[in-house]
């Protein structure tokens, strides 16, 4: 939106597949995201709607850790910050998926860092270090 003529979603196809397997090859989960803005507008409700930025965090962790992280994380919509946040358990007790929608990169990045700090605190006993000012 800040480039050229303010282009948003000016692409033909976005296809992203995320999957995880156990060391023996057993599939734990698979998520496929496909966007074709010229066939199915991403501004539709249920897709991006009014948001421009999308973040996706996958946490592969044992069920007890996933439950504790899930309990500490709220799903919400903040109309002042223009942020929507969701969290779900992945299938096969393999962890969590955390999603954030926003209108600007900075607030989305902040929410993702807060979540990652919660995860690190739960798993390692230490939060993420503060972000350096020049990043």
Locate predicted features:
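A structural signal for small-residue-enriched, beta-sheet-centric alpha/beta enzyme cores
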Residues: 3-135
